């Protein structure tokens, strides 16, 4: 049963991945480019202030969504009364969370030593109400693998919001340029989502439907709260302990690494959850799809993360001297991005096979470890200055995830998919072998050209040389990437560029 809101023709998994990639690549890259332009004009303190407001809103939105997105996607049987009940519960919850956010904004600014934060958070608080109107619609489009509509919506909103933010920054709006960019993006995304979505809520509420949905979503929600703790607690501790400048350096490096993951791995994971759910009763096909998904995710993320690490010093020098302390932080987060490229496929597999409770336990276990690590690290680096504080916290976040959490989730996913470590290693091997080629190629280009080019010129050449070296390794070792290159060349040959009109 497809359930309400599904499109008449379901897209294939491959087509869903393609449009999910278009959505996330465009959205993430546009958003990151906009932030980089604005950050170069404003500096780490303004960026850190908005980041702290965003962390607060992300926490609030956990209680808004309550794991219902995954529940709507995963359920085999879904009716209109389920959707109506979810919509009205979410909307009522949003109203209460909105009022609570307005009340707590002053306290949040005080504990983070950022006086401007209170006003920023209050102005950004309508995002809570906007998000409440998107949860069910977006889940239905994901459930039906309608990622083309989601891609158009996300990219259009990101471009319009980004343009407004950049114009405001050049006009001297300061920190409010970042705030305006986020608000405009959210409003445009909401309008387009309801334009594309076929479902509309009915004026009815079923308590039985709520109970039915929350039986599964509770475990998903607990897992998402744990994910928030492990992914956002570091920013909170940095803000409380060191202030917005350290937060700005830390979050900028994290944003770049996360952009790589969100743009190139998350689309595969988003398409994988409904695909894995449909293959619950076909172990052989589930194993094959799981390995293919891990290989695609790693093949996209790991080379890009290696490249970002290799040129991080050049990149941040271009933003300005006050950002140079973020270069070493990005190197550490490149390792985290590589680990997440594999882990991002383990979690949807466990959810699709009916094990959301397992992911919740694992996520909370890592969160508990992270709490201890962050508190200890923060107490040891108080006198090291913002760059040293940000770097130490980055190591404290990356090490437990890579050395503890990933091996456990991967082992469980392999068991549920009836796969093998060897199969996963074969899938990620081309990406791993591309890393030394990328790093050596990029740094060699920098060493040779340093006397002749400025930072921008060296950055462009280093990216080109490192990318070519890594691409050669991927194409040589991976049939999938070799086939992708062949298809791309065929498309170019069939549609050659024309000179003039």
Regions found by a protein language model. Name each.
Residues 1-32, 65, 70, 78-88, ...:
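N-terminal membrane topogenesis motif
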Residues 2-5, 414-428, 441-501:
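Membrane-proximal transmembrane or re-entrant/amphipathic helices at the cytosolic face
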Residues 105-124, 291, 308-338, 384-389, ...:
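Interfacial segments at transmembrane-helix termini and the short loops linking adjacent helices
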């Amino acid at each position: 049963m497809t359930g309400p809101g599904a499109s008449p023709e379901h897209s294939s998994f491959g087509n869903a991945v393609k449009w999910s990639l278009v959505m996330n690549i465009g959205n993430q890259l546009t958003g990151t480019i906009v932030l980089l332009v604005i950050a170069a004009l404003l500096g780490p303190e303004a960026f850190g202030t908005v980041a702290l407001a965003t962390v607060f809103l992300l926490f609030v939105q956990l209680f808004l969504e309550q794991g219902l997105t995954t529940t709507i996607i995963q359920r085999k049987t879904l009716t209109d009364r389920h959707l109506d009940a979810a919509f009205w519960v979410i909307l009522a919850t949003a109203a209460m969370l909105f009022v609570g956010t307005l009340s707590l904004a002053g306290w949040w600014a005080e504990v983070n030593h950022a006086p401007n934060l209170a006003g920023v958070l209050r102005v950004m608080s309508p995002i809570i109400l906007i998000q409440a109107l998107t949860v069910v619609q977006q889940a239905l489009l994901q459930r039906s693998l309608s990622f083309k509509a989601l891609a158009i919506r996300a990219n259009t909103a990101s471009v319009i919001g980004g343009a407004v933010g950049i114009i405001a920054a050049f006009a001297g709006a300061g920190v409010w340029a970042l705030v305006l960019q986020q608000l405009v993006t959210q409003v445009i995304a909401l309008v387009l989502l309801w334009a594309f979505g076929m479902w509309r809520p009915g004026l009815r509420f079923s308590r039985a439907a709520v109970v039915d949905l929350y039986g599964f979503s509770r475990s998903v929600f607990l897992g998402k709260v744990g994910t928030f703790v492990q992914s956002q607690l570091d920013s909170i501790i940095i803000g409380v302990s060191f202030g917005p400048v350290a937060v700005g350096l830390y979050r900028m490096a994290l944003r770049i690494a996360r952009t790589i993951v969100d743009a190139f791995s998350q689309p595969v994971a988003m398409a994988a959850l409904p695909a894995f759910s449909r293959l619950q009763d076909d172990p052989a096909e589930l194993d094959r799809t799981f390995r293919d998904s891990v290989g695609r995710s790693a093949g996209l993320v790991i080379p890009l993360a290696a490249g970002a690490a290799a040129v991080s010093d050049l990149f941040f020098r271009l933003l300005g001297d006050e950002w140079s302390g973020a270069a070493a932080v990005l190197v550490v987060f490149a390792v985290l991005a590589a680990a997440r490229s594999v882990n991002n496929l383990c979690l949807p597999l466990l959810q699709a096979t009916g094990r959301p409770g397992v992911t919740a336990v694992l996520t909370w276990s890592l969160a508990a470890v992270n709490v201890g690590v962050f508190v200890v690290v923060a107490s040891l680096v108080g006198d090291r200055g913002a760059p040293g504080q940000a770097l130490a916290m980055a190591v404290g976040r990356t090490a437990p995830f890579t050395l503890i959490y990933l091996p456990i989730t991967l082992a469980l996913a392999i068991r549920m998919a009836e796969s093998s470590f060897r199969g996963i290693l074969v899938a990620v091997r081309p990406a791993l072998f591309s890393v030394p080629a990328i790093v050596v190629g990029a740094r060699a280009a920098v060493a040779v050209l340093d006397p002749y080019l400025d930072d921008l010129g060296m950055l462009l050449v280093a990216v080109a040389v490192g990318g070519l070296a890594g691409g050669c390794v991927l194409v040589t070792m991976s049939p999938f990437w070799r086939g992708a290159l062949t298809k791309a060349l065929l498309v170019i040959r069939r549609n050659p560029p024309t000179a003039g009109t």
